[in-house]
Amino acid sequence: MFDVLTEVYSGSSQINSMFSNYIIFLFSSPVLSNFGLYLEYMTPERKGKLATVLSKRQAGLAIVMENVHDPHNIAAVMRTCDAVGIQDIFILNTKIQSHKKFGPRSSSSAAKWLTIHHYNDAGICFLELRKRYSKILTTHLATDSVDLYEIDFTQNVALVFGNEHEGVTEEIRALADGNFIIPQTGIIQSLNISVACAVSIYEAMRQKKAAGHYQQPSLPKERIDGLMKEWGFYEKKV
């Protein structure tokens, strides 16, 4: 059967179109996916692209969003995280309901390439963050806040961004290691959360690149293998 499918899949575009849904169904089934058979039918170019992306994912950098109301802002943060190479995003909702989707389809497409951790308990969320990251910093203007450019992003760091109206709550600031600010010289001393996140993590990327963190895989091999299979499945659904 697999020889027949191979011949069909490598045939004309018209035949591919006729049988694509059938092949997708077969190779997304639990039995076949356990053996990674869907990856066999991914093009070498696509496999190479996914492998390259995964090799640059940064295990030592994460974003936490606390009670962010607008799903479009969450979607924008996700797209920037994917661009920088952040795999893990933590969404903490202690005051609002969890979002069922993040913005329009075109803007939320980055979500399927990321690992989204949902929490509604701040204490449990921070227990997990402490296992992974040596420093947790919140975006908050205070007398003890450090400048973004003073943060050592060669360490394992998680950055916390608050919602659009109140910022990071006092509860979360008490759980974190400190606060940081993005230096500004304008009249309006605030940025949209998606803009603030982009500015912050591109500084992290700059430091990590200079330190050689993008030159070798950061994620454990078993996680890279798992994500490769997961991403292969998504590619069959697109």
Which residues does each PLM region occupy?
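Short, intrinsically disordered low-complexity segments enriched in Ser/Thr with adjacent Pro
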Residues: 3-16
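Post-transcriptional modification and biogenesis factors for structured RNAs
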Residues: 22-238
